[in-house]
């Protein structure tokens, strides 16, 4: 089973909308020994260039506005679905004729489209013993697109067996470094106004000249670098692991989740808003996977509209997780049965603030 295939299976985080494009895997160049800072610096520029060269920003716009592959027309269905907006509010043709309507369209863009991110995960194998044995067979683990986990019964596995390396030893020794590079779609008021005024059309108003214009300008939608986080998988419990594929998924999924958690702590704009699902008890569907610990603190936010109909978030209080009530929602946690694995949410207690209501949002603070 190829690492490429397994890699595709372990990147989806339910706390973020799945906005995946068709292109999700790329080959990483083999670099000579570098420091962590040198690797991150070299890769971020190469990745950013690759993303922009492949017009990933334009493809994100196509995805958001559900572009028709035949007519090139757009619609707001996905924006309505993701943002729970009323259909009449997001009628672009009507909105262009009123300042308030345009403000609400821009608000939808600010709420959703401008918070479009691309996460590129560089996974590198680090176990010296296994790497040395496999390199002797001409296999280099750790570079995406060229690495495979040997399956029992395969020619590679049999060869490894002949060298005296047991399959179980391979599984136990599987450790990785994951560096997650975060990029953000450059979507601002000027870009949005140009799109809606000069490029937008729907299937009721086909304009082939605009289709050609958007096709020509897809490369103008850029992604900018936000930052990166590097984590080490360390030792991983074998609970629930039946084969090499399971181990790869468990190690890499947990490492990527940990890297995402580190990015959230470092960059406020990337932090997830989680709704309170109840106030008795006070709880939300986040846990260890998101890096929640006893020392974590969260602000409680209420969504309000200003006089122009734009969304704002006002802090109404601060809460903290209750000891022994933190949900262990890590990948395959049910097999390890550590504290919190049998919970369905994390329970919080109020530090300050007024009354809270279900649906209010919480966001981690430093």
Model feature map: region roles:
Residues 1-11:
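Single conserved hydrophobic/aromatic residue that forms the stacking wall/gate
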Residues 8, 112-114, 173-178, 279, ...:
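Extracytoplasmic
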Residues 27-165:
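Short, solvent-exposed, polar/charged sequence segments at loop or secondary-structure edges
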Residues 116, 122-235:
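Amphipathic beta-strand/beta-sheet edge segments enriched in Tyr/Trp
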Residues 191-247, 268-272, 276-285, 300-366:
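Beta-strand/loop-dominated core regions that host nucleotide or nucleotide-derived cofactor-binding catalytic loops
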Residues 246-270:
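Short, structured interface segments
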Residues 292-294:
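Short, well-ordered loop/turn sites that connect or cap secondary structure elements
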């Amino acid at each position: 089973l190829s690492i490429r295939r397994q890699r595709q299976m372990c990147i989806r985080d339910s706390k973020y909308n799945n906005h995946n494009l068709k292109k999700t895997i790329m080959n990483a160049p083999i670099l000579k020994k570098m420091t962590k800072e040198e690797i991150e610096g070299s890769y971020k520029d190469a990745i950013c260039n690759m993303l922009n060269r492949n017009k990933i920003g334009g493809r994100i716009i196509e995805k958001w506005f559900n572009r028709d592959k035949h007519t090139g027309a757009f619609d707001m269905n996905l924006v309505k679905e993701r943002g729970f907006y009323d259909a009449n509010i997001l009628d672009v043709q009507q909105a262009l004729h009123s300042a308030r309507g345009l403000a609400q369209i821009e608000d939808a863009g600010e709420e959703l489209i401008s918070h479009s991110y691309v996460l590129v995960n560089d996974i590198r194998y680090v176990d010296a013993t296994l790497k040395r044995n496999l390199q002797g067979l001409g296999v280099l683990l750790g570079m995406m697109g060229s690495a495979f986990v040997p399956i029992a019964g395969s020619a590679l596995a049999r060869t490894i067996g002949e060298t005296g390396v047991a399959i179980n030893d391979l599984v136990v020794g599987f450790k990785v470094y994951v560096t997650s590079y975060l990029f953000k779609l450059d979507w601002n008021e000027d870009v949005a106004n140009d799109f809606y005024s000069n490029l937008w059309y729907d299937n009721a108003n086909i304009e082939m000249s605009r289709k050609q214009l958007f096709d020509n300008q897809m490369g103008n939608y850029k992604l900018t670098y936000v930052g990166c986080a590097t984590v080490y998988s360390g030792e991983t419990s074998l609970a629930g692991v039946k084969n090499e594929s399971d181990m790869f998924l468990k190690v890499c999924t947990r490492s990527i989740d940990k890297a995402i958690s580190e990015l959230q702590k470092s960059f406020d704009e990337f932090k997830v808003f989680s709704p309170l699902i109840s106030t008795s008890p006070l709880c939300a569907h986040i846990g260890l996977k998101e890096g929640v610990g006893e020392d974590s603190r969260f602000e409680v936010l209420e969504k309000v509209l200003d006089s122009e109909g734009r969304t704002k978030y006002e802090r109404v209080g601060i809460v903290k997780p209750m000891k022994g009530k933190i949900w262990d929602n890590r990948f395959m946690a049910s097999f390890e049965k550590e504290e919190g694995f049998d919970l369905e949410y994390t329970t919080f207690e109020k530090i300050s603030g007024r009354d809270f209501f279900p649906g209010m949002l919480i966001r981690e603070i430093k």
